[in-house]
Amino acid sequence: YGSMRDLVLGLTVVLPDGEVIRTGGRARKSAAGYDLTRLFIGSEGTLGVITELTLRLFGQPECAQSAMCSFASMQAATATVVDALRYGLCLNRIELADSVQMNAINRHTQSELVEKPTLFLELTGSKPGVEHDLAVLEGLIQDNGALAFERAQTQEQTNRIWRIRHSALYASRSSSVRSRTLS
């Protein structure tokens, strides 16, 4: 859905001198000067204390479908992402792990996944829309030479795909004594 900066429509801020200001509005774009909403969000509290936020909200999608696929090269994996975006597919999540990361995941989780660049994908929307986009995506994946493709058929399989993806941080940390997590 984008970054927090994209989701904040307006806010109320208390400036260091005590003045209270309100930013934003209903207009998507404005030529009325600086975009104070984005300025304050980007400052992460250094320019003033944010006391209220008006956020853009999204409803729960009717349907969600997860998949993961491996490719012989990063170029093939990224070409698939570029193609999917060009087609305007309803992708909610796209994450990429390279071969080094997949090796670390295998060692950390005692799995036997393909140790090549791997995409973790989630499509969301209406059931017919997701089914259509998934068919298009499967074609793009094949066109770009996927080595392996797994489409989640059950909630358990969906959970497995995202559990694998979320193990990447811990796999990386356990792969080296000197590793550190930066955020």
Language model features with spans:
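Noncatalytic alpha-helical scaffold of FAD-dependent oxidoreductases
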Residues: 1-183
